[in-house]
Regions:
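Bacterial Sec-type N-terminal signal peptides, specifically the leucine/valine-rich hydrophobic h-region
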Residues: 17-20
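Repetitive helical segments and hydrophobic/amphipathic motifs
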Residues: 11-14
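A residue-level marker of the well-folded mature domains of exported/periplasmic proteins
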Residues: 2-9, 22-319
Length: 319
């Protein structure tokens, strides 16, 4: 059974909470008596390196790998499961020690993850779950979705029609939808009149939100499952001549912060994540597993917090 553990959103507290005594390159003996290999090489696979969220995650893992003295390689999955399958096979051929994976498809990546484990690679899922991974670190995405939709509902006065820009079939997106559903269940006067999959991207969200607004021109709000989706929805609303729709997202990205800093923007709130911390914590967990130690918790949840135009001045943002 997996145990969930919540980390404070600072690197220091995260590492302390995990008690990562294994963060060295020393070879130790595990319970079976076999010597574990050193962590000399680390790979990171993400859905889309063009997304600033994953660029921040890349920064976190790179810094942690350099602190270990390990070589580091990051790969862009380009939102394509087949690409990620091929990348895992390439990492297997390279014989890397640790693979941190942000899966395009949490279930579909399972066989490739198993191949990596069979080849002796330690695999930890980051930001989204991945079938057969040995551990997972992610934002508390149920909380993130709930906070974003609660903010939206409050700002539209607790009643009205809304649209949802959904995303790819990953655990993080599914959990955000679950959290939003919890907020909606507590507010029966709010009804969802349209839901479409924006593939987590701004351009796709722009197109489908334009179509949904044509069909439902009187909506009061839009929830985007991530900030690129919410930003695309914001542009669609602007192009449709709207000015009073409330739009919320999830991420706390630099682009969202910039958009929300305008008092006239319809983008009103985002549930913040800490991608840098997610990446560095995932590597810390992998090092501990590689050393033969048992994790206190094999699923770690990092809390989210809501950011609005009124709280931007105290929001630290991504690094």
């Amino acid at each position: 059974m997996k145990i969930l553990k919540t980390l404070a959103m600072t690197g220091t507290l995260a590492i302390a909470a995990l008690s990562l005594t294994g963060c060295t390159n020393e070879i130790v003996t595990n319970d079976s008596g076999a010597a574990s290999t050193e962590v000399n090489s680390v790979g990171l696979m993400v859905q889309d390196l063009g997304n600033p969220f994953f660029a921040s995650m890349d920064n976190g893992v790179k810094a942690a790998a350099e602190a270990l003295g390990a070589t580091y390689t990051a790969q862009d999955g380009r939102q394509d499961l087949a690409v990620q399958n091929n990348q895992i096979d390439a990492f297997i051929q390279q014989g890397i020690d640790v693979l941190l994976i942000n899966a395009v498809d949490s279930e579909g990546i399972g066989p490739a993850v198993q191949r990596a484990k069979d080849a002796g690679i330690t695999v930890v899922a980051v930001d989204v779950g991945a079938k057969n991974a040995e551990a997972t670190v992610t934002t508390d995405n149920v909380e993130a979705g709930r906070l974003s939709c609660e903010s939206l509902i409050k700002q539209i006065g607790g009643a009205g029609e809304i649209l949802i820009v959904d995303g790819t079939p990953t655990t993080s997106i599914q959990d955000r939808m679950t959290g939003c559903g919890e907020a909606l269940a507590a507010n029966p006067d709010v009804s969802v009149v349209g839901t479409q999959n924006g593939d987590n991207g701004r351009e796709r969200a722009l197109t489908l939100t334009t179509d949904m607004l044509t069909a439902h021109p009187d909506v009061a709000g839009i929830f985007g499952v991530n900030d690129p989706s919410a930003l695309g929805a914001t542009l669609a609303a602007q192009q449709a001549g709207k000015s009073d729709i409330v739009i919320t997202g999830v991420d706390g990205s630099p682009e969202a912060v910039k958009e929300m800093s305008s008092a006239s923007s319809m983008f009103k709130a985002t549930s913040a994540q800490n991608p840098n911390l997610l990446g560095s914590t995932a590597l810390d967990m992998a090092v501990q597993l590689r050393s033969g130690e048992t994790l206190d918790n094999d699923t770690v949840l990092v809390p989210s917090s809501i950011v609005t135009g009124e709280t931007l001045s105290t929001y630290e943002g991504w690094v």
